[in-house]
Design a protein with these regions (language model features):
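Histidine/acidic residue-rich metal-binding segments in metalloenzymes
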Residues: 1-12
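Short C-terminal domain-edge/linker segments immediately following a structured domain
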Residues: 2, 41-47, 114-121
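His/Asp/Glu-enriched, well-ordered alpha-helical/loop segment
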Residues: 11-12, 17-87
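C-terminal cap of metal-dependent C-N hydrolases
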Residues: 30, 81-131
Length: 131
């Protein structure tokens, strides 16, 4: 937390790594590392924002990675390609197998009510509304 606040840590990533059931339903020391995390990542960030301002956290997985990798920042202007997410940091949602978008189900947050809801993702001319 201190590293993010003081700028030592520049980027936070989800490290989304789905695993099939067979690689997880075994003794702990034999199980493959990794969980699904893309779908719950924003909710985890909102939880962390109780200790770190949300605007700082948003930069760690949006503009800062692009800056480090030399990727041009997106802009919202006429003629530019859209690339942004609409979210509600106060919204809540229930994460269960019915709403899970992954082929895998290895998540510690399965069947939890989570705070911080992604409403839609806009990329180019495509809009994906999240229900």
């Amino acid at each position: 937390i201190d590293g993010i606040k003081d700028g030592t840590i520049d980027v936070i990533a989800s490290h989304h790594q789905p695993q099939d059931v067979d690689t997880k339903k075994c003794e702990f020391e034999k199980a493959n590392f990794g969980i699904i995390s893309i779908q719950t990542f924003f909710s985890n960030i909102v939880e962390l924002s109780r200790k770190i301002p949300l605007d700082i956290l948003l930069k760690t997985f949006s503009s800062k990675p692009k800056e480090i990798l030399g990727i041009e920042r997106s802009s919202i202007s006429e003629g530019s390609k859209a690339s942004f997410t609409i979210f509600n940091s106060d919204g809540s949602w229930d994460y269960d197998e019915k709403i899970n978008l992954s082929k895998s189900i290895n998540s510690p947050w399965l069947n939890w009510s989570l705070k911080g809801r992604v409403e839609a993702v806009i990329k180019g001319n495509k809009i994906k509304e999240i229900i």
